[in-house]
């Protein structure tokens, strides 16, 4: 069953009367990479964090439907929320690795949602999970790095670990919050290629918040442009002409 995500009337206010997200409506269905672009402060990261319930939406619906069932992520609580979040992989801008742990240990944290508190505390993991972790390290180009500490890795290597950790969850939906913002151009391309490839291989939608319009054009089959907490564009890269980019970002100096 293909994964679908339906967002309806999503609002997020950090201060009353000043919404960061102002009535977002968005449907994501089937595999493929969707890029979210827009200026800083327009709510791109807030949107992804609402989907994964790292922050609480103020109002609206976030309905995830996949092989495990249908759940409104905006309303679910407690153990039901814990189970729902297992279905969503998240790749973070600043990697969000445990620096003192090895690469292998960081990957295995992606299975904590499936592991008892005692086994997690004792660092006891299923042999099948360990085997999968080694396979994923090979997939992301880090074979042989299992025993290296995370703080010994380059930025690109850390992001690859972050992607592998997200895939350890066997997610039905993969979110990536500015995954290339701290990387050089060559590594940024490699990370986008990896996200696109893994979305296709695993048959899941990938939703990427990205600041680089050209990378979005190159890899996304769908681009969502946000401005002022609203969706102002939803289409492919061909529709992102100078007029539309001005609508999304405001001004023209950045186009020169």
From Swiss-Prot:
Keywords: ATP-binding, Cell inner membrane, Cell membrane, Membrane, Nucleotide-binding, Phosphonate transport, Translocase, Transport. The keyword Transmembrane does not apply. GO terms for molecular function: ABC-type phosphonate transporter activity; ATP binding; ATP hydrolysis activity. Its main location: membrane. Transmembrane segments: none annotated. The keyword ATP-binding applies. It comes from the Bacteria. Its EC number is 7.3.2.2. One of its GO terms (cellular component) is plasma membrane. It is a peripheral membrane protein. Residues 5-253 form the ABC transporter domain. ATP binds at residues 38-45. It catalyses: phosphonate(out) + ATP + H2O = phosphonate(in) + ADP + phosphate + H(+). Belongs to the ABC transporter superfamily. Phosphonates importer (TC 3.A.1.9.1) family. Part of the ABC transporter complex PhnCDE involved in phosphonates import. Responsible for energy coupling to the transport system. The complex is composed of two ATP-binding proteins (PhnC), two transmembrane proteins (PhnE) and a solute-binding protein (PhnD). This is Phosphonates import ATP-binding protein PhnC. It comes from Bordetella bronchiseptica (strain ATCC BAA-588 / NCTC 13252 / RB50). The gene is phnC.
């Amino acid at each position: 069953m293909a994964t679908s995500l339906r967002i309806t009337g999503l609002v997020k206010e950090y201060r009353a009367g000043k919404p960061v997200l102002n009535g977002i409506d968005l449907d994501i269905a089937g595999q493929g990479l969707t890029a979210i672009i827009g200026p800083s402060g327009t709510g791109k990261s807030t949107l992804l964090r609402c989907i994964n319930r790292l922050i609480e939406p103020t109002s609206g619906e976030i309905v995830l439907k996949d092989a495990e069932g249908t759940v409104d992520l905006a309303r679910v609580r407690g153990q039901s929320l814990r189970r729902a979040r297992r279905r969503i992989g998240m790749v973070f801008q600043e990697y969000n690795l445990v620096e003192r742990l090895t690469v292998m240990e960081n990957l295995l944290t992606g299975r904590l949602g499936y592991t008892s508190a005692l086994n997690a505390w004792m660092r006891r993991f299923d042999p099948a999970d360990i085997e999968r972790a080694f396979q994923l390290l090979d997939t992301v180009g880090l074979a042989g790095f299992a025993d290296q500490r995370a703080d010994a890795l380059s930025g690109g290597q850390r992001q690859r670990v972050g992607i592998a950790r997200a895939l350890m969850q066997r997610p039905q939906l993969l979110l990536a919050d500015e995954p290339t913002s701290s990387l050089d151009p060559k590594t940024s391309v490699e990370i986008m290629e990896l996200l696109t490839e893994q979305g296709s291989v695993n048959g899941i939608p990938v939703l990427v918040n990205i600041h680089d319009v050209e990378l979005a054009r190159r890899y996304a089959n769908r681009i969502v442009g946000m401005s002022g907490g609203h969706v102002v564009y939803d289409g492919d890269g061909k529709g992102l002409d100078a007029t539309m980019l001005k609508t999304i970002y405001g001004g023209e100096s950045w186009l020169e």
